[in-house]
A protein has these predicted regions:
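Interfacial segments of multi-pass membrane proteins
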Residues: 46-49, 68, 72-76, 105-134, ...
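Loop-to-transmembrane alpha-helix initiation sites
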Residues: 137-144, 156-166
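Short, non-helical or kinked segments that cap or interrupt transmembrane helices
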Residues: 30-39, 97-107, 136-144
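Acidic (Asp/Glu-rich) catalytic motifs at the cytosolic membrane interface
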Residues: 23, 34, 42, 46, ...
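Alpha-helical transmembrane segments in multi-pass membrane proteins
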Residues: 7, 11-16, 20, 24, ...
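Membrane-embedded alpha-helical segments of multi-pass transporters/permeases
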Residues: 20, 69-70, 96, 132, ...
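Cytosolic, membrane-interface loops and tails of multi-pass inner-membrane proteins
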Residues: 21-53, 176, 180-192
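C-terminal ends of transmembrane helices
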Residues: 20-23, 91-100, 127-134, 176-181
Length: 192
């Protein structure tokens, strides 16, 4: 029980680190939550004018997902899936931001790297194609997470796909405002 609580705590707290907010406050003296979509993630950092900080945010948000899961695999492997979930929830519901946060895509990508390198490659390639064609980051993220789920189901079966199904549902939930905007034609496109 103590081990499970420890995994919940460090995974959630690691996920809660708001790198987008920290970097923009540190280097631009602005609060990213008051710019663009108000989101703390890499897409909003990029849209708000700092591509370099956006890329660094993407890397750090991904790394916290990867690190949390790798620690758990090596120390408490029986709580592997719990760590996958808690690091994501930490990012989306950060304790440091009054339980608000990002959409979780970069953290999800980092978790994929902890599984193997095929899954993030599938995600990044499909995300790139969908986003380049549609110019909607949200659409690329949701469809790509479904493609990862489908691949995992076909290759590894039902039981190993449950965490990816959970991520797919969670990403739909975190992108619900984007989905509404897509349906009404008011979703912002990204300039590439």
């Amino acid at each position: 029980m103590e081990q499970m609580l420890l995994v919940i705590a460090y995974s959630y707290l690691l996920g809660s680190i708001p790198f987008g907010l920290i970097l923009t406050k540190l280097f631009t003296k602005t609060d990213i939550r008051k710019k663009g979509s108000g989101n703390i993630g890499a897409t909003n950092v990029i849209r708000s004018g700092s591509k370099i900080l956006g890329v660094i945010t993407l890397i750090l948000d991904s790394f916290k997902g990867y690190l949390s899961v790798i620690i758990t695999i090596n120390i408490f492997p029986e709580y592997f899936y719990l760590s996958c979930l808690m690091v994501f929830l930490g990012h989306v519901f950060s304790i440091w931001l009054k339980f608000k946060g990002g959409k979780g895509v970069a953290t999800y990508l980092g978790v994929l790297f902890a599984f193997d390198f095929i899954l993030p490659a599938i995600f990044v390639i499909s995300w790139s194609v969908i986003t380049l064609i549609s110019r909607y980051v949200s659409l690329g993220s949701i469809i790509s997470s479904f493609i990862v789920l489908l691949y995992n189901f076909l290759v590894y079966g039902f039981n190993n796909s449950l965490i990816f199904f959970a991520y797919f549902i969670l990403l739909i939930i975190t992108h619900r405002s984007n989905l509404s905007k897509l349906l009404t034609g008011s979703e912002n496109k990204i300039n590439l």
